[in-house]
């Protein structure tokens, strides 16, 4: 029995212009949270129809921040899919909540929304759908279900930058939408991620949570 090589990920496209742009940043001496980051957030905001965008060190970080903004914590349950990277469940555990796995649709391999509804209990506070290989779930059904049961939705769209639902870009609607810029994603900054948010207060909280961890003696949450 011959051994086949593992299915390869796409090699990121890094051209000379990209290399030169990185060099410009390194020579500027401002290599983190500088004007290039602000410009990137502005471009993303325009792409998502003017929604608020905040960038962070990873897509994992953005999902945890979204859960904390949504008030998820100890004693709560968050429904998600078992077909995902471990970070999707880990961020739920990190908040003190319990991940509850709903089965997948055998055709799309995405979370089965009928199974999600069957898994809802009085402790359920949120749903994290994962858009496997960039394929979104039925967004109309997802948000109708969330509204029916008063649940928040944190979209794990790590692989879905550029995907659409009924002509609308993923990220241009919804509660919280998390994208990843890790090395094998649609676009990459080596590592990184962004959170697309609904309103200015949520954006303020998204900025404050990481600062509260870095400077706990100066800031309080929320």
Feature locations, PLM:
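PLP-dependent aminotransferase-like
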Residues: 68-157, 164
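PLP-dependent aminotransferase class I/II
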Residues: 37-43, 47-51, 114, 118, ...
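Structured loop/turn residues at beta-strand edges in well-structured enzyme cores
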Residues: 48, 73, 122, 171-172, ...
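Radical SAM/AdoMet-radical enzyme domain recognition
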Residues: 145-150, 168-176
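Active-site region of PLP-dependent enzymes
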Residues: 160-166, 173-222
